Amino acid sequence: MSTTEASLYPRDGHITEEGISEHAAESTFREVDDSRRSIPAIEFRDVTMEFDGRKVLNNLSFKVNRGETKIILGGSGCGKSTTIKLVLGLLKPDEGQILVDGEDITNYSEVDIMHVRKKIGMIFQEGALFDSLSVYENVAFKLHEQGVPEEEVENEVRRMLRFVNLEDAIDKMPSELSGGMRRRVGIARALVGDPKIVMFDEPTAGLDPPTARTICELAMKLRDLEDVSSIFVTHEMNNLDYLCSEYAVVNEAGDVVFEKEGEKLCLIISKVLMMKDGQVIFSGTDEALRRAEDPYIQKFLRGH
C-alpha cells in the first residue's frame, strides 16, 4: 500500500479492498482538500531580520508545500527557531514577506494574526505543559477556553491522546510522566482543532534514542496519513534519517506501520534545509545533502 492509498488513519482498523478505511470520512483528522494544493503552506520571500545590528536572517527564501515536511538543520544561532517565531507572528521581519496558506502575514497585528495561529499546531522542546493541570485538562485547555461542551471536549481529547498512544495517561499529572510522555501530551494538545500546519521546535532534544524515535514516528504519521505540512527544526541526524527514509502506512490489520520500501516516496515529501548565519546553504533531499562538498556541511555531518 502506498502513502497515497493510506492517506487517512482509520479509527476502527477496517480496510476495504482498495486499502482505504471503511470510515475514511471519519478519519482522525479531516480529509484533504485538493483545491488549494498548489498554494504553499508556508513561504518565505527574501526575509531579513536583525537583532542588535546582527543579521539573524539574511534574504531567507523557501517554501513548504502541502503535505511536506521541511527539516531545518543548522548549528545554534543560525536562525532556525527565529524562522518558527516568524511563522507564528511572534516576530516581524525587517524586510521580505511571509505567507501562511497563501496569506501575507508580514505586517499583521496581534489581533490580525490570531486566526492564522489557529491553523498552526506548535510543539515546543519541553512540551510546555501546565504542571497544575492533568493530562486531560492540558489537552482540553484550548477547547475549554472556547466554551466547547464537555462531552465534545472529552471525545476530542481522547481522540488526540489515542493518536499519540497515551489515552491510558488521561488522568495523570505532568509530574507523573516521563520526558517523552510529556512531549507526546504536548503534541496531542497542539493537534486539537486539526491544524494542517505543525511546527516542531527541537522536539527530541534531551530525549533517549527510543523516545526520540517515537516522536519522529508521530511526525511521520501526521505527514503521511493526515497530509499535514510541517517545519521540523532539529540538529540531530537520527531525526533526519527517520523522516527521510521511512513512511507510515496502515496495514491490512488496520495498524500503523513504518515502511522503508519505496524510499523515493518519502524523499518527495521530506526535504532538508540547512542554514548557516541566517542563510540557506543547502536545500534538497537528504541524499543530496550527504553528497554535498561544502566544508561546513561535511563538518556538521561528521559531528552528528
Predicted regions span which residues?
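Catalytic Walker B motif of ABC-type/P-loop ATPase nucleotide-binding domains
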Residues: 198-201
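Helical segment within the ABC ATPase nucleotide-binding domain
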Residues: 213-226, 245-246, 263
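Conserved ABC ATPase "signature" region
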Residues: 103-104, 144, 151-169
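Conserved ABC ATPase signature
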Residues: 173-177, 181
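Helix-to-loop junction immediately C-terminal to a conserved catalytic motif
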Residues: 88
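Short coil-to-helix segment of the ABC ATPase nucleotide-binding domain corresponding to the Q-loop/switch region
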Residues: 133-140
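A short, proline-enriched helix->beta-strand linker immediately N-terminal to the Walker B motif
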Residues: 192-196
